Design a protein with these regions (language model features):
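Nudix hydrolase/Nudix homology domain
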Residues: 1-16, 87-89, 99, 126-128, ...
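Acidic, metal-coordinating catalytic segment for phosphate/diphosphate chemistry
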Residues: 20-64
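A generic fold-level signal
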Residues: 27-28, 58-60, 68, 134-137, ...
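A short coil-to-beta-strand element that immediately follows conserved catalytic motifs
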Residues: 117-126
Length: 202
């Protein structure tokens, strides 16, 4: 019995070590996002997976970047795995601001290789609160204007669409576009020509 007890003890220790290693690996891969108060100030952080299991309990910052090309909005289809508005049309660039990351650095990281192009300067448009039955987000909306097809090709993905304001307006409230986009379009519609001039003008 004593030997059996030792074997069981060793197995328990090995099991705990494996369990802790797996937990540590999982935590390293976890996305940690800031928790904001109602004034938009960071008051802590939480794992994104935990936040998603508690609908609307926490307020998180995200960035969204509209893409303008030849006076049209560049839109792509969101993944079917997206937590909000899966399989709908939206901007190609959107991301959570991670804990201890700035909004500016998140914009650059989200743009990827386009951020290296000196002629592409993200311009801040508006900051607003987005809220539905799942999430509460402080959205920082930016715009970039692409001048060349080469730049456009850098953000090409599947199910791409270049939409004029009129084409988009005709399809609003039909489930085609993401909830974020639906809320932002009225603002974009009133400023899109200004925004294009603002970021593309000489």
């Amino acid at each position: 019995y004593r030997e059996l007890g030792l074997v069981i003890g060793v197995l328990v220790i090995v099991y705990e070590q494996i369990r802790l290693s797996l937990m540590q690996g999982s935590l390293k891969k976890e996305m940690w996002v800031p928790v904001l108060n109602d004034n938009g100030k960071v008051i802590g952080c939480i794992a994104r997976s935990v936040s998603r299991s508690l609908p609307k309990k926490y307020y998180h910052p995200i960035v969204r970047i509209a893409v303008v090309y030849n006076g049209m909005l560049y839109l792509v289809r969101r993944s079917k795995d997206e937590f909000v508005s899966p399989d709908t049309m939206d901007y190609p660039f959107h991301n959570y601001v991670l804990f201890r990351h700035s909004i500016d650095s998140t914009v650059k990281e989200t743009l990827g290789s386009l951020a290296q192009d000196k002629s592409i300067a993200p311009r801040f448009l508006i900051r607003y609160t987005f809220e539905n039955e799942k999430v509460k987000h402080l959205v920082s909306l930016y715009v970039i204007c692409l001048r060349t097809e080469e730049q456009l090709n850098q953000c090409k993905r599947r199910s791409v669409k270049l939409g004029t304001a009129k084409q988009i307006e005709e399809n609003l409230s039909s489930g085609v576009f993401s909830e974020y986009f639906e809320k932002e379009f009225a603002y974009l519609q009133n400023t899109i020509l200004f925004a294009e001039s603002f970021c593309c003008g000489n």
